[in-house]
Amino acid sequence: MTVFLSFAFFAAILTHIGCSNQRRSPENGGRRYNRIQHGQCAYTFILPEHDGNCRESATEQYNTNALQRDAPHVETDFSSQKLQHLEHVMENYTQWLQKLENYIVENMKSEMAQIQQNAVQNHTATMLEIGTSLLSQTAEQTRKLTDVETQVLNQTSRLEIQLLENSLSTYELEKQLLQQTNEILKIQEKNSLLEHKILEMEGKHKEELDTLKEEKENLQGLVTRQTFIIQELEKQLSRATSNNSVLQKQQLELMDTVHNLVSLCTKEVLLKGGKREEEKPFRDCADVYQAGFNKSGIYTIYFNNMPEPKKVFCNMDVNEGGWTVIQHREDGSLDFQRGWKEYKMGFGNPSGEYWLGNEFIFAITSQRQYMLRIELMDWEGNRAYSQYDRFHIGNQKQNYRLYLKGHTGTAGKQSSLILHGADFSTKDADNDNCMCKCALMLTGGWWFDACGPSNLNGMFYTAGQNHGKLNGIKWHYFKGPSYSLRSTTMMIRPLDF
């Protein structure tokens, strides 16, 4: 936009400024235009020419090299007035310029407002078109997104269902795997136990084989020696047969000697019978002790309804003495795997390992009331005992049934003997309460009941081989069910001792 303004006073001041600062050439006569660009607006000012009556400046009128006159120049007052006039004109022009500036600013504000309004209207229409286009595009995109979302939801639902099915299948598989793992662990534990038992059995079998080999070698040596002895005997027999007359003579001499011995024995029996009538017989070791014999050893005692006396070992040292020993184990020199008759009448030597005999035990305990004391020792040297306040057994018809009362001692808080009554069993007389025949399985003769927690007549095992032996000399509540003891002693004493 171009605005043409003409101001006389503005032209005059510009003419004066032009006269003061520059000279125009004669060929530039007429009007002069001054164009000012301000942003988008251009302003053109028409300026009139000056009249050419400008006075020469002081520098042109005076010679700078001339001497100063004594009196002031006549033009000085005129210049002062002219300067004041110019200052007054400048003030007026300044006011006009300020008004012009205000006018331009106000016009520019209204024009700028109009331009902005037009621009806003144009922009609004454009924005509406763009908004409408965007809305349509947004609606289309929204529809597409909705379709995609629906497809994603459907696919997600299918995946979730499949994932759930897979989770259930995985859970079932994990459960089955856990069960199989537990079964495998149980099988492994059983296999470990079986391997351990097999190793133990192999060790035992190896030891038994070594023992059998040693016994075989010993037997072979014994057979060799016996063969040699038999050969020597055969030689002697051949020599004796050849000398029949000498044998007949010796036979006659032996017959005479036998007759003499028979006569002497008859006299000795008659003499002993007379002494028995004179001396009071001992019923048990308590009578021996009370008769003044307080040293442990072998003594002869007599039983009611028994034709012959019996040699027994009397313990005079344990718990004030007077104990009649009915069983003793110490070194395994005697085999306790015997039949009913041998356990009935007894076997062994009272000075070592022996069993007194069930018939004699019944005869003693039928005389008066007795207590029972059992002394035990393990292979580590530990000693213990079990004592019963009442002890007796039945007769043979009752299978020598055991009767006990009142248990005390250090060999376990509970009794390893059956208190309520158990019949005696041997390998040839099964009187226990078990189908397994305890006497055959556990060896020895004992009051087994249903095999029970004790067997002091079992197999004797030496040190190092006494563990894990169910058929050994056992007392369950002292050393457990499979520990074979080193020594045992069963002894009885009258309750009123």
Curated annotation (Swiss-Prot):
Glycans are attached at residues 92, 122, 154, 243, 294. It comes from the Eukaryota. Its main location: secreted. PROSITE patterns: FIBRINOGEN_C_1, FIBRINOGEN_C_2. GO terms for cellular component: collagen-containing extracellular matrix; extracellular space; membrane raft; microvillus; plasma membrane. Residues 1-19 form the signal peptide. One of its GO terms (molecular function) is receptor ligand activity. SMART domains: FBG (SM00186). Keywords: Angiogenesis, Coiled coil, Developmental protein, Differentiation, Disulfide bond, Glycoprotein, Secreted, Signal. It is found in: Secreted. InterPro entries: FIB_ANG-like, Fibrinogen-like_C, Fibrinogen_a/b/g_C_1, Fibrinogen_a/b/g_C_dom, Fibrinogen_CS. Residues 81-119, 153-261 form a coiled coil. Residues 276-496 form the Fibrinogen C-terminal domain. GO terms for biological process: angiogenesis; animal organ regeneration; blood coagulation; cell surface receptor protein tyrosine kinase signaling pathway; cell-substrate adhesion; glomerulus vasculature development; hemopoiesis; heparin proteoglycan biosynthetic process. Disulfide bonds join 285-314, 438-451. Binds and activates TIE2 receptor by inducing its tyrosine phosphorylation. Implicated in endothelial developmental processes later and distinct from that of VEGF. Appears to play a crucial role in mediating reciprocal interactions between the endothelium and surrounding matrix and mesenchyme. Mediates blood vessel maturation/stability. It may play an important role in the heart early development. Homooligomer. Interacts with TEK/TIE2. Interacts with SVEP1/polydom. Interacts with THBD; this interaction significantly inhibits the generation of activated PC and TAFIa/CPB2 by the thrombin/thrombomodulin complex. This is Angiopoietin-1. The lineage of its organism: Eukaryota, Metazoa, Chordata, Craniata, Vertebrata.
